[in-house]
Design a protein with these regions (language model features):
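Active-site glycine- and acidic-residue-rich loops that bind
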Residues: 1-8
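His/Asp/Glu-enriched, well-ordered alpha-helical/loop segment
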Residues: 8, 12, 16-141, 147, ...
Length: 167
């Protein structure tokens, strides 16, 4: 949990031991205003190293850490694909190369957590026989400009096959 600042040696051990880290992208954009000062430039290179971990063959279980963080899936998705704060700011040395593709970010909050909890047969994808938990937005998060992600509105939420919210 909170695999935010792990050394290269620890990253290798994650791979060797097939550890699935749990990370909260909103922590990265919340921390960017002070993390470099607290961790220093050497250590910040390994902070929130999503790309490094995925490129080594790991999956990442994403979470919101609510109620510590807001718990808004748009913020988590935006943070994962931009590594910028809600105003579009990113700090020098913040390693934008560690951001995820939109497809990876989607998996970070769907199938990868299901795999991490050994529930991929029941969760993580929309298929017959699965729980069918999902939200639909009024904009396509996979294709709109990144600054528009936060403007998308939830128009439908389904939990366990039942509509729990509809605009």
């Amino acid at each position: 949990e909170h695999s935010q600042n792990i050394t290269p040696d620890d990253q290798r051990r994650f791979v060797e031991l097939d550890i699935i880290p749990s990370m909260q992208p909103s922590h990265a954009i919340g921390d960017l205003h002070f993390a470099i000062d607290r961790l220093g430039l050497d250590r910040i290179n390994n902070a929130y190293a999503w790309r490094n971990l995925i490129d080594q063959g790991l999956i990442i279980a994403g979470g919101t850490d609510a109620p510590v963080e807001i718990g808004d899936p748009r913020i988590e998705f935006y943070a994962a694909v931009t590594r910028k704060d809600l105003d579009g700011f990113h700090a020098e040395g913040w390693n934008l190369d560690q951001k995820l593709t939109r497809y990876e970010a989607l998996k970070m909050f769907t199938i990868w957590p299901a795999i991490a909890s050994f529930e991929e047969e029941a969760k993580g994808t929309i298929e017959v026989g699965k729980f069918a938990d999902f939200s639909i937005f009024d904009k396509d998060l996979m294709s709109i400009p990144e600054q528009k992600i936060l403007e998308a509105n939830n128009i439908l939420t389904v939990v366990n096959g039942r509509v729990v919210f509809q605009e």
